Structures are given as C-alpha cells and as structure tokens.
Amino acid sequence: MNERIFAQVRQQFPLLQRTVNGKRLVYLDSAATSQKPVSVLDAERTFYQTLNANVHRGVHTLSVKATEAYENARATVAKFINTDTDQIVFVRNATEAINLVARTWARQNVKNGDMIVLTQAEHHSNIVPWQELAKEAGARIGYVRVDENGVLRQDDLAELLQHKPKLFAFTHVSNVLGTINPAKDMIRKAHAAGALVLLDAAQSVPHMAVDVDDLDCDFMVFSGHKMLGPMGIGVLYGRKK
C-alpha cells in the first residue's frame, strides 16, 4: 500500500486523527477490536435519527422500515459467507453465539461419557462454555495440542477422533499467533468420525474469504466489532439439518 492510499484509509477513521502523548495514534490492536470508519458511524447515526423502532414488532412506518433494514443486513451477512438468510442468527458477539450452541444443541445432545474436542489454541470464549457443559453432562474434553511452531498437531486430532466425539470446536485463525488452521480438512475428518463442528471465525471472517458452504461446518461464529462494525452485534451461522 503506497503512502497516498494509506493516508486515504486513515482519513476514514475519525479516532485515528487524534494524538496520544503528543504523537499521531498508531492502533495495532484490531485483533481485540477494530476501529470504526465514518461510514459505520454515519449509518448508526442515520438509523437512530430516522428509523429507530423495534423490528418485527410493529406495523407502523418506522417499525416496518427498521425491520427492512434489519433483514437487509441479514441478507448482506448471508451473502458475505455464502449461505441463506434462514441460517443466520444475530447475537451480541461470538461469545454469546458459542454459549447459545452450548446451551441449546449441545445440552440436548452431549451426554454422560461423550467427548468434546477442543484445541490448545482456543480463546477462552471457546473453552469455558464447553467446560461448563462437560461438568453438567458428565462429558469429557480432549485437547488438540499445539506444536513448537504454533501449529495444531493433526496426529492429536486423529487420535481424539477415534473416540467418536459429539462435537469438535476450534478456531479458524488464532487470535494470538495468527496461525491459519486447515479448517476444511479438519472439518472433513471430524464429520467422518461422526462429530458436528463449530468453527470460531472471529479472526478469519474480517480478513479472508470464508465460504461456509465450501467449509461444510455445522456452526460458525464471528463478531461485528472485530470487522469495523459496532459493538453488540455478532453472528451465529447454523446449518439446517
């Protein structure tokens, strides 16, 4: 990226125009949360100034228009990850999406003695809900280890899949190392062992093309605030069976 284009991009982010300790702000924490461009700030302002109303709960003009905007956003998200709108559930963030799966599908299907497979590379939001579920259901958790290069050990995965786990939940891209896991191949192996797969795509969807139809995962989660969107909005993709 040349200097002129870089400057044009910076201009789209009002917060980056401020200074910190007398110096121009350089923000390097987008893996935690991204800053918001003026187009997003303007869209939020426009909604609250011109459309603010409950969605799917009224027949007056504002409610109808707000519902249209809400469903148009769902259609945009569905197209972005190559799926249908009826497989997109809006939640507050990826953490809530994972907990929703844990407290609905998993609570009904993971029983005493069953195994859940995770990896050592997971964010706590993709560990704690499964630990709580395992304690509640009497299930076991197996972890795919990370090697000295920060790569998931595929031999560990092969061994754990021999236990016929009910669920394999793992991150597409590490929030710590940036490691890109071979998700499609890992999902295929998990399905062959009879497991459903939840993919934490909070770090991948903002930065790379993600096609849920091609990946063939059963659940996928991500957050708006990590991809230039506002806080308080996230997505749970759930494949219809």
List each language-model region with its residue ranges.
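Pyridoxal 5′-phosphate
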Residues: 1-241
